[in-house]
Design a protein with these regions (language model features):
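Hinge/cleft segment of the Venus flytrap/periplasmic-binding protein
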Residues: 8, 272, 276-320
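Hydrophobic membrane-insertion alpha-helices, especially the h-region
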Residues: 8-24
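Extracytoplasmic "Venus flytrap"
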Residues: 39-56, 61, 70-81, 105
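Structural motif
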Residues: 70-92, 194-214, 228-230
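Periplasmic-binding protein-like
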Residues: 94-102, 121-125, 163-167, 193-194, ...
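Hydrophobic alpha-helical
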Residues: 99-116, 199-254
Length: 320
């Protein structure tokens, strides 16, 4: 009888001891947290607000792929010089990879070549620097996108009329590739082409206002979202406003498209662009030196088709 009582007391106690040991040791928990990959993200302009959806895609990819992002935004007037300094600093700090949105392809090529040769991989977004050693470029086919915008503007600008192209890029980028392609299409179709460039530190709105006082364009074309937003803000509500076309799919751009201030836009999935860019940077950090990525699809969207399901995904992305 005593033995039976003893067993009844000891067995539960042993069970509790085993349970306690299992809880304290927790074999399912790694003894040390897995180290995150460090990826530095360098924007090309001081105002990065138009990259907000792409940034959400980057952050989601970082969460999914066990990476940590450091966002760096140039603050000075010489964007290329500041990006060079940031590239060198981040490479020296030991970051695992750099995601670069170049402000000037030619000015940054040597720096990219030097740091990639020294072992820090670089992936670019929007502007291709693979010839300088970057592992990959994520973005649309800029020439095709520019041609599409040029063809769209042909519909609103009669033969012989003037089309003004907004030129705010400080150097050679994917944005200037778009502009060059659009200009070639317009000139081949018998349209006059002018360019609007800010001078002496003026903003784009002032430059466009100045341009409109001396020119009477039938259409204006912008080649990135920031320029398109500013042009739309200036032209909104003006009775004599030229037709406005451009690249970009921000919430502000969508609002102006709905109001018919913007006639047509070339839009791509910005969330996907950001996600794929970080994914490529993770691949590069893992040792894949170079790899080919298909260009991102873009779509021409007008007010009348902006609420079609596929276009809604571009203009009003649902993020996790």
């Amino acid at each position: 009888m005593k033995r039976k009582v003893l067993l009844q007391l000891v067995v539960p106690l042993l069970s509790l001891c085993v349970l306690f040991l299992l809880l304290t040791m927790d074999p399912m928990r790694p003894s040390q947290a897995e180290k995150l990959l460090e990826i530095s993200v360098l924007f090309r302009q001081s105002d990065a607000s138009t990259w907000s959806v792409a940034r959400q895609g980057m952050e989601q990819a970082a969460l999914d792929l066990n990476a940590e992002l450091r966002f760096l935004i140039p603050a000075g007037e010489d964007l290329a010089a500041e990006q060079r300094e940031l590239l060198e600093r981040e490479a020296e700090s030991g970051t695992n990879a750099i995601l670069l949105i170049p402000s000037d392809r030619e000015a940054l090529a040597d720096t990219v070549k030097n740091i990639t040769s020294a072992g820090t991989p670089v992936v670019t977004l929007e502007t291709d620097l693979c010839d300088a050693g970057a592992s990959a470029c994520v973005g649309a086919d800029n020439t095709a996108l520019g041609q599409a915008l040029g063809n769209a503007a042909l519909n609103g600008a009669p033969e012989g009329s003037l089309v003004v192209l907004l030129d705010t890029a400080a150097g050679s980028t994917g944005v200037t590739d778009r502009m060059d392609a659009a200009q070639a299409v317009l000139e081949a179709a018998g349209r006059q082409v002018g360019q609007c460039r800010p001078i002496d530190g003026e903003g784009l709105a002032s430059a466009l206002e100045r341009t409109l006082t001396v020119m009477r364009p039938a259409a204006v074309v912008a080649f990135d979202a920031a320029d398109l937003e500013q042009a739309a803000a200036l032209l909104s509500g003006r009775e004599d406003a030229p037709l406005l076309y451009g690249a970009g799919s921000t919430a502000t751009v969508a609002a102006y498209l709905e109001q018919s201030t913007i006639v047509s836009i070339a839009a791509q999935n910005e969330f996907a662009a950001g996600y794929l860019a970080v994914g490529a940077a993770v691949q590069a950090a893992a040792g894949q030196e170079s790899f080919q990525l298909d260009p991102l699809e873009f779509f021409l969207v007008r007010q009348e088709n902006m609420y079609e399901p596929e276009n809604q995904k571009l203009l009003f992305p649902v993020t996790r």
